Amino acid sequence: MELIPNLSIETWVLLAISLVLIYIYGTYSHGTFKKLGIPGPKPLPFFGTILGYHDGTWKFDETCYKKYGKIWGFYDGRVPVLAIADPEIIKTVLVKECYSNFTNRRSFGPVGFMKKSITISKDEEWKRLRTLLSPAFTSGKLKEMFPIIGQYGDTLVKNLRREEEKGKPVNMKEILGAYSMDVITGTSFGVNVDSLNNPEDPFVQKARKILKFNFFDPFILSIILFPFLTTIYDLLRFSIFPRQSTNFFKKFITTMKKNRLHSNQKTRMDFFQLMMNTQNSKGKESQKALSDLEMAAQAIIFIFAGYESTSTSICLVLYELATHPDVQKKLHDEIDSALPNKAPVTYDVLMGMEYLDMVINEGLRLYPIANRLERISKKAVEINGLFIPKGITVMVPTYPLHRDPEYWPEPEEFRPERFSKENKGSIDPYVYMPFGNGPRNCIGMRFALLSMKLAVVSVLQNFTLQTCEQTENHLKFARQIILQPENPIILKIISRDKPITGA
């Protein structure tokens, strides 16, 4: 049997040309940074440098930061991405030229009607949504909403007390994931779901399906390797957001809106109601009101963007408190002083706790959940001698910036005092960006901080946290787009009504 097929010369030529064209297609953009004189890891055909994500994007960025400095280039498949860690250039990208050039984030696959969400929308549509939604996230509105959020803090304590009475270490992500889910669904959809004790509730199940996003999923990988497939997937009505879940929430929004419009009960002040309030006659005339579909998109994106980030951040802060008893004691003292005899938590008292704020900020520095900020350059531009071509994706790597010893002495140490009144003013806002920066920063920043602070105070008001045999001494992080522990954080919790024994 012949190993080489007996083909005509013409066939061999066509085959060779085809292979060359395929190779060119898979590599044609891979010379972008070499031409610009920008260093970076060597790309592979089609894959670019994404195989470097095997330990997580945060680790890839940290490695590149140490090797190449404050500017480097890499490739997500065939897409060139310019990493910028220079504070002055970051300021220009995120703030100074946000409206004129760096307005939009990267399009990432087919998203269906979710393109109407504030996170994914572009240009004038984004500006319109930001204008409509920003009033819902002011301090005043959050204070009005606090009684709703506060009840989930009570549920959190009840769930923890039930676990504590079992006398076993607690999986903190399980408990705090339920808290985060309840807060977001309660404020975005106006429903009370005790998700820890009702895991089979269809609302909880549909929400959790939205959260299953894996960079190495074959569907996602196909989009990275062959971007043209996005157009085909759009025509086929495929989406990175599961249709079963998005359809469920669309129907739910319509039903909930009808119920509220025809209800004689006092209006519940939550994000859902605030979105409904844009649909007044004046808003309709000016075409500024949110449509029902846009309301659904915002509510879904709140789950997608808020659940994992908030619950993981709280877990990591509590982990640091358990491993730093001196910090925990100091925070216990502040809580006991501000809320004597376990007084109910109020918005004003919560926001006035200085040491709590320091602890939360330091936790977000060590563990920036959104470890990348991205913008697209709409036109060719030069910033501080750096030429940025039109259409290039610009990425700010927050993880290595948050741990750079140039800005943070002994960066691996958990030191809330970095964010004291005396020190906070000296922190460059472009090397500390847990919620991004500029006009397109995280719109839910105040809400996320409020949720985190309420959870931490609710826990520490009632419990002391300790490490146990199952607690990892050095956390390992998963191969995910966002920063999250590979294994659950397990802690021992002790009621403060009981005497504390050794760990």
Swiss-Prot record:
GO MF term set: heme binding; iron ion binding; lithocholate 6beta-hydroxylase activity; oxidoreductase activity, acting on paired donors, with incorporation or reduction of molecular oxygen, reduced flavin or flavoprotein as one donor, and incorporation of one atom of oxygen; testosterone 6-beta-hydroxylase activity
GO biological process, one term: oxidative demethylation
Enzyme Commission designation: 1.14.14.138
Record-level GO cellular component terms: endoplasmic reticulum membrane
InterPro entries: Cyt_P450 (IPR001128), Cyt_P450_CS (IPR017972), Cyt_P450_E_CYP3A (IPR008072), Cyt_P450_E_grp-II (IPR002402), Cyt_P450_sf (IPR036396), Cytochrome_P450_3A (IPR050705)
Disulfide bond residue pairs: none
This protein's record includes keyword Disulfide bond: no
Positions annotated to bind heme: C442
Subcellular location: Endoplasmic reticulum membrane; Microsome membrane
Necessary cofactors: heme
Recorded catalytic activity of this chain's protein: lithocholate + reduced [NADPH--hemoprotein reductase] + O2 = 6beta-hydroxylithocholate + oxidized [NADPH--hemoprotein reductase] + H2O + H(+)
Membrane topology, record value: Peripheral membrane protein
UniProt entry keywords in alphabetical sequence: Endoplasmic reticulum, Heme, Iron, Membrane, Metal-binding, Microsome, Monooxygenase, Oxidoreductase
Induction remark: P450 can be induced to high levels in liver and other tissues by various foreign compounds, including drugs, pesticides, and carcinogens.
Function recorded in the entry: Catalyzes the 6 beta-hydroxylation of lithocholic acid and steroid hormones.
Recorded family membership: Belongs to the cytochrome P450 family.
Protein name: Lithocholate 6-beta-hydroxylase
Protein encoded by which gene: CYP3A10
